[in-house]
């Protein structure tokens, strides 16, 4: 149902622009299904002894939940669809109990910097490319440090040829098992998707820039760039590169498309390095470490300086 909700929401939002008569009933169906889901979810929430409540992906009546404790799916098993519905599906608000519970469960399940025991292998194993699903949910929720460490952990589980096995044992596993495809191309696609969202993240009608860039990413002084990446606001090209001294500069270009309601960017890129100028657009530095830039501006350049 979570995938269905995410898909219906996407169709509903698209039809608000397209106004296709055949799809006019999608909005009411989505609302009806979401209400039914929320009612069922409130009854299925589980209180975890670690101090949070979460929504399991298997209902209490599922035969798998009646197995011996060793063979029973873990609380974090199959939470991938919940990650997808949180982001990019954006079915829930950031303070929804489903979101809060999912994040707490994934954090509590983290081993070797990524969520563990989330797939077919229930004991001392990781489903590698589940990690970027969760990292993107963290990033959308504003948990930048968790997103960064989880994505870094995911990269550290790649093979020497920069590919990922679907599931593999933890380093401490007493009995190692491997499961699934090798390499798994979905894993490679998720790597690209997260890297894109580090620079350009669509949050509803808001555009969040550099959300996933943290100081360690800038230590080598290497530039970052996206060229014509598709967004709901038109194709965007965006680059970040070193400038004179310790400064960094960015260049933003947005082509045809409706402008977002807001464009946000980090005020402080590095300790002691602050957004000083935006040429080509008005900007306002907020007290929360976020600067807003005129969303109607299609091209601008910015610079962070001491």
Question: Which positions does each model-derived feature cover?
Answer:
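Active-site core of glycosidic bond-cleaving carbohydrate-active enzymes
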Residues: 1-2, 6-17, 24-35, 46-201
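Structured alpha-helical bundle/scaffold domains in large eukaryotic membrane-trafficking regulators
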Residues: 45, 49, 207-210
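Short coil/turn linker and secondary-structure boundary residues
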Residues: 21, 94, 221-224
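Non-catalytic C-terminal accessory modules of carbohydrate-active enzymes
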Residues: 145-306
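Short, intrinsically disordered, low-complexity segments enriched in Ser/Thr and Pro
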Residues: 27-28, 32, 38, 260-267
